[in-house]
Amino acid sequence: MPLKSPFYDSSDNLIHDGWLLLRASNTPCTVLRPEIRSRFLLLSLQKPSADESPDNDKELSSNPDSGKKRKRRVLFSKAQTYELERRFRQQRYLSAPEREHLASLIRLTPTQVKIWFQNHRYKMKRARSEKGMEVTPLPSPRRVAVPVLVRDGKPCHTLKAQDFNPATFPTGIPFSAYSAQSLHHMQYNAQFLFYH
């Protein structure tokens, strides 16, 4: 697609293509002949057209004769977006086979699905942080002492209140390892189970 510029005409296609290649490879203009260098400098001073925007500057088309030099931004259909969002709600990360399967279902490439998921994760993270809903780690689960109902491989059917020696618990674990509330709860449950 020709640039809209007074310095550009249809005969400049070769110069323009060369300029794009030099820009992409970061080659200095000083390696060019002086008459071509001046045209490259004029081209480099122009604002990029829609086809040369920084978003699209990375990938050149494999077909040099096709008027388009850059890949355009892909707009997904409502059905594709719906399916991507539905799957994202189920699973925030997809394995390669899952990506390929989803891509084939909604007629996208696995790379497009991967990038959509990356962008959507970032979008959700940013939205959470803006709302002050930053994910806080859950507190670690509370440790609770459980009464031993088996002793030496045999069920403890005759467990009595005197078996709860204040110095040690039946398994030989020091009393200090359990909170007083946990032991009281265990004593109450043991008495309830065996005396009622």
Swiss-Prot record:
Region (Disordered): 48-72
Residue ranges flagged as DNA-binding region: 69-128
InterPro entries: HD, HD_metazoa, Homeobox_CS, Homeobox_NK-like, Homeodomain-like_sf
Protein name, per record: Homeobox protein XENK-2
Major location category of this protein: nucleus
CDD domains noted in UniProt: homeodomain
GO cellular component, as recorded: nucleus
Coiled-coil annotated spans: none
Species this protein is from: Xenopus laevis
Family: Belongs to the NK-2 homeobox family.
One of the GO BP terms on file: regulation of transcription by RNA polymerase II
GO MF, any single term: RNA polymerase II cis-regulatory region sequence-specific DNA binding
Record has Ribonucleoprotein as a keyword: no
Alphabetic keyword roster: Developmental protein, DNA-binding, Homeobox, Nucleus
The UniProt record lists the keyword Membrane: no
Tissue expression summary: Forebrain and midbrain.
Localization annotation: Nucleus
